[in-house]
Amino acid sequence: MRQKIDCFLTCDCIDNLKEEIARLRNSRTIQNIVLLTADASDNGDDYPEGCTLMEVDSPRSAETIRKIAATATAEYILFLTKATTLTIGQTALERLLRVASDSNAAMVYSDHYSVEGGKLVNHPAIDYQKGSVRDDFDFGSLIMIKTPLVQKYARENQDSQLAFAGLYDLRLFLSREGEIFHLNEFLYTEEEQDLRASGQKQFDYVNPANRKVQVEMEQCVTRHLERIGALIDTSDYKTPDFNEQDFDTEATVVIPVRNRERTIRDAIESALSQRAGFDYNVIVVDNHSTDHTGDIVEEIRQKDQRLIHIIPERNDLGIGGCWNLAINDARCGRFAVQLDSDDLYSGDDTLQRIVDAFKRDKAAMIIGSYRMCDFDLNTLPPGLIDHHEWTDENGPNNALRINGLGAPRAFFTPLLRQIQFPNTSYGEDYALGLIFSRRYRIGRIFDELYLCRRWGGNSDAALSIEKINANNLYKDRLRTLEISARQQMLKGKEDIMADTPLLRFFNRQVETWDDARRRYRDLQKVETRELQYEDHTLTLQYNPARITSTGASIDRKAIAERPCFLCEANRPQEQFKKIIDDRFELLVNPYPILPTHFTIPSKRHEPQRIKGNFDEMMRLLTDYPDLMVK
């Protein structure tokens, strides 16, 4: 394993690396050592023996990658990607080299130790996945890459002007060319320079000061998604039918909560104080609070019947599970709108503006903008989080790169019921945003609608590296799933769930009507037999459950004496209706002979004859092709 590695070390102070450079010079695995510096003239001839200096603009630019590619001659490149004090572990280089060779990986990275405030702590990394396309993936500062692949990237990107995203673009390229391999061994020690809490770091990507960086990153991830066959074309989006189901309430504010006695009253009162030109309610799902949260909710409910207090029967629900409980409740409105139990709406028009945006944008999901503030509503950096990087054309693609989509989030309830939240307490909203954006538009409101209060009780205020890794691993898993789903969709594979308004209407009816659900289930017991008649095949069905309707007397006297079961006043309370035009309604037939069986009655009490209505029926088949029996 002699002289297999060329080292490229980012350096802003040579003294920080002198000891490590001396050890590298004595390693039999090292061929060349190159120090990357912003201004080689500053160091003059005062740099360690056996090294060369390379002047670069930034270790992350495409120009730097090209210079490294032109200089490297060894089989592998060891790249220190940031200026930091570094100590490579005993035999770590030999281990990296062996793993790189055995795995045949395009790139290898490892766990490391971190010096934080003078204290040595473990800093494990996580495995790289197909969905690890976010630009802030934590590889640590030391990576090993196959030299021929870096050179191939340089040849294919000779004209790239990426000033900030060159290293990110290289990584995406490497993931297409081979495996990015995580060696979960602690192989080196670096000094951590960013000691901010996780709750502060997580908003770096929306800081306006980083706008140029983010533009480049978006360009790179867009090209990557196109090359792997996962780029969404938003011109192919579906348009939601907001009238596909009847709702008693237009909108519902959903507040999942557990042990927030200090903030829940403010959140509920913020929701109930909304001024809107429609009926709305508030569903609080109290996930078995052990403090006074439940008492506070119940006290408010006694005074305002718009507040619905739900306590789950289950004890295994996360935030996503609490959301599912709320949206599947019959009292949930047409649009379900988020409000966290820590937070507030900025004004009394938030709900109205969100519902207006649904109808204006013909979107299935709406996301607003929020301001970071402390408990007393004083603004905290970076202030307004408006996700102005989002565009209608490319937002759904760039969403795979960033860590969040914004707040408040609102959903068209029938679609939300079809998809359902994952039962987690982290990333559940992000998962829904990705899935919605695969086929439907996400509308944005770039004005402030929401106050995100940061305080010591926030669940994400200051997380351990283990918790950060668990969160990042999960979101990367969501991205992996979404990229796979988009690749399959773009190849023509149909979704596991039929995504049409009529089938959602049908499924909701069967879910909420026990007798009808039983009869549809019993269709599996129906016996059929085929008969040939000339050139036609006839199918006979033996369906005992159908005898109730088919065996009923239909003589004139019996019909006159029997209430018309098609008239709305005589229908079962459980039966939904869908108005399809000014003459006809659509009902789910509770005595089916087909797996999906609709009835189309006239709104007027009159003989239900197809004669004279053929043109109308053909128009309905054009508007609702799901009605066709094939």
Stretches with model-predicted labels:
Residues K4-N16, S27, L36, A251-T263, ...:
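A conserved hydrophobic helix/loop-capping motif in glycosyltransferases and polysaccharide synthases
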Residues E20-Q31, E269-D279:
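Short, acidic, metal-binding catalytic loop of nucleotide-sugar glycosyltransferases
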Residues T37-D45, T85, D286-I296, N315:
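A conserved acidic beta->alpha catalytic loop
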Residues D57-T71, E313-R331:
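Glycine-rich, basic loop-to-helix element that forms the pyrophosphate-binding segment
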Residues Q90-N122, D349-P382:
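Conserved donor NDP-sugar-binding/catalytic core segment of glycosyltransferases
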Residues G117-S141, S369, P382-I402:
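Short, flexible, basic/aromatic active-site loop/helix in glycosyltransferases
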Residues S160-L170, S425-L432:
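Acidic donor-binding loop at a coil-to-helix junction in glycosyltransferase catalytic cores
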Residues D495-P607, G612, L627:
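Active-site microenvironments that recognize anionic phosphate/pyrophosphate groups
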